[in-house]
Amino acid sequence: MKEKTIGILGGMGPEATLDCYSRIISSTPAKTDQEHLRVIIDSNPKVPDRTAAIIAAGQSPVPVLVAGCRALQQAGADFIIIPCVSAHFFLDEIQQQIALPILSIFDVVTETIISDHPQIKTVGLMGTTGTINCGLFQKRLAVKGIETRVADETQQSKVMEAIYDIKNSQPARSRTQITSDLVAVADGLISKGARGIIAGCTEIPLVLKQEHLSVPYFDALTILARAAIFKAGLTPIP
């Protein structure tokens, strides 16, 4: 089968985009440069804030996202991934305007939970307030019989502070401190009955790892990267 070219619609944020590409590289079964997949990246950090658009009637990111998808298609991509969970709120609207298929991060994470940990029926979801409030991730999980626990308002504000601090090149606190806050939120979700934790924002896996948690950790960014490798025609490294 002819390998497909991956298009990454990135910049939301830039470090998450870099991490996504790094995970594609590290999970590709390649022994030489030539055995790696072709990847085209449009990293545009000028995309309007997705959470502001979802919960506060901010500027819609859709026109910029559609333009990015079209640029990727013009450059030769066969399909697109978006390493930003909040941007998936607009996925249907974007998909209606472009011909290339876009992998849904909601779908690939849900499928991974079912295939790898079928016994898990309750998960904790950590993400932006936009992702949590729109409820699309929760609905996708519910269709497959998986219940979702989310943080209360106080804990959710800590998640948002952590996400924006990760995006900040010069944050006022260390990443160790950021990790500590996110671990506390995750532990709170576990105490509410979560048997797994979803990193439902692509910044979160930059600081929160499986070693920090007592339950299975579903890193949406890694799952998306691996799904992209598979769709491109290769089997990712286990």
Residue ranges and their predicted role:
Residues 1-238:
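Non-catalytic structural scaffold of enzyme domains
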